[in-house]
Regions:
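Serine-dependent carboxylesterase/thioesterase catalytic core
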Residues: 1, 5-23, 27-125, 138
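C-terminal catalytic-base region of ester-bond hydrolases, centering on the histidine
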Residues: 121-185
């Protein structure tokens, strides 16, 4: 899957990384968030888990935000969102125009003011870093920002940010230090 190389790279950096999979076109974001909350609760109660960080890509970033709005783990660490459609996604807008409201993800992730993603609380109290893709045709740079974000960086990438060669180092840097490594000069 798309996040497997990132998971392996984070493991090489010393993180105990676990991929949690869901079917993006089946079920609502709230349904996925409830399932993620249950998984997070189990990890939060595990005695060998010191910190519980979250990394989400695209719709998965919104699932993470929604799950953390439902319940905050006691051991919550940092959150990294890659190409998050925090204010809606161009691709969802297009899907909504082409297919109508039949696709839940398109309804929930579109840029309309009353869409799920635009009603979701910004979670300004999260220790959250955001990585945006410079050439993302699904999510605009402006839509990636979130009030209260700790740091924001743009990588020269398409929407497939988890596969970018610098993404694992940037994610690890933020999880450890609470900031990204910005290019000097």
């Amino acid at each position: 899957m798309l996040l497997d190389p990132l998971r392996r790279a984070l493991q090489r950096q010393g993180f105990r990384a676990v991929n949690w999979h869901y079917r993006s076109l089946r079920g609502s974001i709230e349904t996925h968030a409830a399932a993620l909350t249950a998984k997070a609760r189990a990890l939060d109660e595990a005695p060998d888990v010191e910190r519980l960080h979250f990394v989400g890509h695209s719709m998965g970033a919104i699932v993470v935000r929604s799950a953390l709005a439902l319940s905050r783990p006691r051991k919550l660490g940092r959150v990294v969102l890659l190409a998050p459609p925090n204010r809606g996604a161009r691709l969802a807008d297009l899907a909504l125009r082409l297919f109508g409201p039949r696709i839940a993800a398109a309804r929930e992730l579109c840029s309309q003011p009353d869409s799920y993603v635009n009603r979701l609380a910004p979670a300004a109290d999260l220790d959250c870093g955001i990585i945006a893709a410079a050439w993302d045709h699904a999510v605009s740079l402006a839509s990636t920002h979130l009030p209260g974000e700790r740091d924001h960086i743009i990588l020269r990438s398409l929407h497939t940010l988890p596969l970018h060669r610098h993404a694992p180092a940037q994610v690890g840097q933020f999880l450890r230090e609470g900031r990204f490594q910005h290019a000097s000069g």
